[in-house]
Design a protein with these regions (language model features):
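Signature of long, low-cysteine stretches enriched in small and polar/charged residues
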Residues: 26-87, 197-261, 275
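Charge-rich, low-complexity N-terminal segments
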Residues: 101, 105-124, 154-172
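Solvent-exposed alpha-helical segments and adjacent loops
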Residues: 1-3, 11, 52, 57-120
Length: 295
């Protein structure tokens, strides 16, 4: 009976992400197979977590599982947990979930970015306006460019049973003066976001503009984290268009400019009615995390 291990994995890796629109999507899709079910199909999966129970294992909950790359397939990441018992396995899973997730996401980002080109046109604008560069898809176009606000996006048409739908992935980069550290709070970040988007991002209907959702179903979340040894303040939430029906999820990171005079925010947003948004948002997350300052 591996139910305790299954529960630990499902509750840690398969929990619903509530900072996306309904219906909520799990952070990771989780499937379980026992040792006898590990066949060629399973070995083709891109992300695999192996839990091995051995009473004589020398491992214990103090040891962080290390990733194995390309074990059975190309562009694959495998984590193996060796535990002495079910209880020990659950302890290791609970203790190292965040580290394993971080490793998986960084691996995802690297694979996504491997397909992105230079996009010199967009990066020339980003360097001029904000002194940064991003690893962008080559089909990401410049929608708007000002001294402190840049909007890039790409659109595609996707079909489902109800016909054709436009899918949009966009990037905003904006900067504003760094007055004090209180600006690194979710309230201040959303205030600045809304004022800039009202000014720069208008819908097709008169008096329509993008704004952050703040209703009871909009579970906007924030966390401080390190990216490339630099402090960043990350916000996840939902956006909508005032006086129109568009909406979707966004993720942003904010950090100090190199001279520490300004805050630079890099945001990705998705518009994909009728379609799941997790992977589309993850593609933008990879782009955001690729930021580098230019000199």
């Amino acid at each position: 009976d591996n139910s305790k291990i299954s529960y630990a994995i499902k509750s840690n890796f398969g929990q619903l992400v509530t900072s996306t629109p309904l219906p909520y999507e799990p952070e990771f899709d989780v499937e379980f197979v026992d040792q006898g079910g590990v066949n060629k199909m399973i070995k083709r999966h891109k992300t695999i977590l192996i839990v091995n129970i051995d009473p004589f294992s020398k491992n214990n909950s103090k040891e962080m599982p290390t990733p194995i790359f390309d074990l059975w397939a190309k562009n694959q990441i495998v984590y193996k947990i060796n535990a002495t018992s079910q209880k020990n396995a659950v302890t290791i899973i609970n203790h190292y979930t965040d580290s394993i997730k971080l490793g998986i996401n960084q691996f995802y980002y690297a694979n996504i970015l491997a397909f992105n080109g230079e996009n010199k046109k967009a990066n020339t604008i980003l360097k001029k306006n904000h002194s940064i560069k991003l690893k962008l898809p080559s089909n990401m176009l410049i929608k708007k460019s000002t001294a402190n606000f840049t909007w890039l996006n790409r659109t595609e048409i996707k079909k489902d049973n109800n016909g054709d739908h436009e899918i949009q992935q966009g990037i905003f980069v904006y900067s504003y003066p760094y007055i004090n550290e209180n600006l690194f709070s979710i309230e201040q970040q959303i205030t600045f976001r809304d004022s800039l988007l009202k000014k720069h991002v208008h819908g097709s209907v008169a008096n329509s503009y993008m704004i952050t959702r703040k209703d009871e179903l909009a579970n906007n979340q924030a966390q401080a984290q390190l990216i490339k040894n630099k402090y960043v303040f990350s916000v996840r939430g939902l956006w909508r268009v005032e006086n129109d029906k568009m909406g979707g999820p966004f993720i942003s990171i904010s950090t100090l400019s190199e001279d520490e005079k300004n805050i630079i925010t890099i945001e990705g947003y998705v518009y994909a009615p009728n379609f799941e948004k997790r992977e589309l948002l993850k593609e933008l997350e990879a782009v955001i995390h690729s930021f580098e300052f230019t000199h």
